[in-house]
Amino acid sequence: MKNIISLVSKKKAASKNEDKNISESSRDIVNQQEVFNTEDFEEGKKDSAFELDHLEFTTNSAQLGDSDEDNENVINEMNATDDANEANSEEKSMTLKQALLKYPKAALWSILVSTTLVMEGYDTALLSALYALPVFQRKFGTLNGEGSYEITSQWQIGLNMCVLCGEMIGLQITTYMVEFMGNRYTMITALGLLTAYIFILYYCKSLAMIAVGQILSAIPWGCFQSLAVTYASEVCPLALRYYMTSYSNICWLFGQIFASGIMKNSQENLGNSDLGYKLPFALQWIWPAPLMIGIFFAPESPWWLVRKDRVAEARKSLSRILSGKGAEKDIQVDLTLKQIELTIEKERLLASKSGSFFNCFKGVNGRRTRLACLTWVAQNSSGAVLLGYSTYFFERAGMATDKAFTFSLIQYCLGLAGTLCSWVISGRVGRWTILTYGLAFQMVCLFIIGGMGFGSGSSASNGAGGLLLALSFFYNAGIGAVVYCIVAEIPSAELRTKTIVLARICYNLMAVINAILTPYMLNVSDWNWGAKTGLYWGGFTAVTLAWVIIDLPETTGRTFSEINELFNQGVPARKFASTVVDPFGKGKTQHDSLADESISQSSSIKQRELNAADKC
């Protein structure tokens, strides 16, 4: 903060003698050029070594001219760059404690918006658990070869496909709604629609009605999937980003724990009543109304407002997000706003300000889109599907129904513990490390589960169940939590929402494959693999781990501006952590840049001479 106050003091002093300072600054900068050799400079110009451009972000320098007005504009741009650098440095050096003291409201607003994902986690776990509920099986199922009722594989696939297709429709609609009305009103609209769609599920008379209710309810869920992560990443500083984006995973787990507890109660107390499946559907009405009220009062993302050229509103939004008061708060708001403006302006210069889906696949953005998509696909290609079918899996592994529901509840609680564990270790190791080690442990668990499928008796089924609990812990301590942060950090600011939408669509496409295959793997009347399913997913996890090691960069400790620069420079994945970048430059004039270039060339020549002398 001392740096901020010092910076503002300097600006105030400069503003009192503005015209005089501009002229003096011009003369001082020109005088400084005597430090480097004019002949080298002229020769460099001939060789096009020093190409003079006007003030652009691609040069990190500005050209001083003969006009005082032009020089004033140049120096204003230099000051803006200094402001952005100051904000970037402040964000990087901020500790978790400092971030919580300075941005407590940002954290709370982020938590509120992400809580919408509780409903999706709840319904995802609910639908899978209903397949194992006796009253639901008798009401909507058919007799199998063993003389018991079950929901056929075809209907399980169909219902799951309805959810995934609805989510993909919702994701596509979300991108256009956000462009038109912003994050807040898009989420409020989605919550209102969800409230109406729940009626279809509550009054369902057939699996076809459930299918209609699921596909319609999934449209708002698609909105929540993309906007919760986007909002959290844009309102919170670097020190809070991992915690607030991975909180999305905690919301999923809260929903799944809630669903498991309700389904356990239904199995024990409402096993022969239609309320056994109606009550779980009805409880979804708890969430929308309070969330709609809370989100209405939430500030809009300042990044979205700047992208829409609504800078004054972005300033107000930042003022609501930041704590403090008086001049100190105003200074911090100005610096942060300038950082956002310059980051977005630089992206627009590089991408010709085109924000279409096609731009997500062009040039540097193509790499960023690929990484975001494959990172989210990795959640579905590493055996996580078994966690969604845990109750059904436990039954097919030989457990009694009541014990299977108990194990599922324990599984989700362990998943919550795993996510909290990832919060602890994220302060010590990077995102990439958390992801790779998490996948490695998952792979081991899955292969052992698959091996136990060749055994028989209660010991084998209990062992497989215990390892599925361990799988839940490692999944949520690793890829389950960290993916939300990585997917939010990888895209550019201009294309963040669209890239996250594309990534989530890819996630859902992989989930479609899982939804088709998994019921066949587990159902007695089909492939009946049981615990052997672990071998299949262990192999997929190994492939996923290999891709992460080779292609996924480390973004820990990087601001959005620095991540942009790393991608623009084409830095290889394994060099992201060690590469030093200067996203905004240092507010230099072109003369400063030429001097630096000359000094750099001179140093390079001297180094070559020393190397030649050493060889001799």
UniProtKB/Swiss-Prot annotation:
Topology Extracellular: residue spans: 137-150, 208, 264-278, 392-404, 455-466, 521-532
UniProt-listed InterPro entries: MFS_dom (IPR020846), MFS_sugar_transport-like (IPR005828), MFS_Sugar_Transporters (IPR050360), MFS_trans_sf (IPR036259), Sugar/inositol_transpt (IPR003663)
Induction: By maltose and maltotriose. Repressed by glucose.
Residues annotated as signal peptide: none
Compartment(s): Cell membrane
Glycosylation sites noted in the Swiss-Prot or TrEMBL record: 523
Top-rank lineage group of the source organism: Eukaryota
GO biological process: alpha-glucoside transport; carbohydrate transport; disaccharide catabolic process; maltose metabolic process; maltose transport; trehalose transport
Compositional bias per record (Basic and acidic residues), positions renumbered to this chain: 15-27, 606-616
MF GO annotations: alpha-glucoside:proton symporter activity; carbohydrate:proton symporter activity; maltose:proton symporter activity; trehalose transmembrane transporter activity
Region (Disordered): 15-40, 587-616
Key words of the record: Cell membrane, Glycoprotein, Maltose metabolism, Membrane, Sugar transport, Symport, Transmembrane, Transmembrane helix, Transport
Cellular component terms (Gene Ontology): membrane; plasma membrane
Cytoplasmic topological intervals: 1-115, 172-186, 230-242, 300-370, 426-433, 488-499, 554-616
Transmembrane segments: 116-136, 151-171, 187-207, 209-229, 243-263, 279-299, 371-391, 405-425, 434-454, 467-487, 500-520, 533-553
Membrane topology type: Multi-pass membrane protein
Pfam families, per database record: Sugar_tr
Function: High-affinity uptake of alpha-glucosides such as maltose, turanose, isomaltose, alpha-methylglucoside, maltotriose, palatinose, trehalose, melezitose and glucose. Acts with the concomitant transport of protons into the cell (symport system).
PANTHER family assigned to the protein according to its UniProt record, in alphabetical order: ALPHA-GLUCOSIDES PERMEASE MPH2-RELATED (PTHR48022:SF5), PLASTIDIC GLUCOSE TRANSPORTER 4 (PTHR48022)
Record family assignment: Belongs to the major facilitator superfamily. Sugar transporter (TC 2.A.1.1) family.
Name of protein: General alpha-glucoside permease
Native source species: Saccharomyces cerevisiae (strain ATCC 204508 / S288c) (Baker's yeast)
Protein's gene: MAL11
